[in-house]
């Protein structure tokens, strides 16, 4: 299989990145072809996979995390159209994934209640909500690998 792995940022000290690394290594050991797309990579590149770093502009009016994630996703969609992948695996919530490795908590259930109701009018909320809904919403075709039953239940409560 030709697999596209998508992850906003890789750091050798992040639990999500370590999980990603183990999954990538296992896929390569089983003979699959892997292409990794990230916006930022810290550390060594594992052998056997192709890497594309889709950087955000260094000086940009869109410097916030949610805006950078949207820029990454837009660039990623262009790259994915250039090649035919059998499966697109995401380690962060974003539209267009075939498979999502669920390591993050539910944004709508966990983070949003911490803010006043007006927060839902912000670009940050709209961006993060749309990415989460693309994975967990009723119309989504994304397969989800959930890390725990509690996490699964939380997403089911909101989606």
Question: Model-derived features: where do they sit?
Answer:
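An amphipathic, basic-hydrophobic alpha-helix
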Residues: 60-88, 126-134
């Amino acid at each position: 299989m030709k697999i596209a792995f998508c992850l906003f940022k890789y750091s050798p000290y992040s639990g999500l990145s370590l999980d990603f690394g183990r999954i990538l290594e296992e896929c390569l050991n089983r003979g699959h072809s892997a292409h990794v797309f990230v916006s930022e990579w810290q550390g060594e590149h594992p052998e056997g996979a192709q890497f594309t770093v889709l950087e955000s502009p260094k000086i940009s009016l869109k410097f916030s995390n949610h805006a950078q994630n949207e820029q990454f996703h837009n660039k990623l969609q262009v790259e994915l159209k250039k090649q035919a992948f059998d499966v697109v695996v995401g380690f962060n919530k974003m539209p267009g994934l075939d498979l999502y490795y669920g390591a993050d908590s539910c944004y709508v259930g966990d983070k949003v209640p911490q803010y006043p109701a007006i927060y839902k009018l912000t670009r940050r909320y709209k961006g993060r909500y749309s990415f989460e809904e693309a994975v967990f919403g009723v119309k989504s075709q994304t397969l989800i690998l959930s890390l725990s039953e509690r996490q699964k239940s939380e997403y089911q409560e909101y989606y």
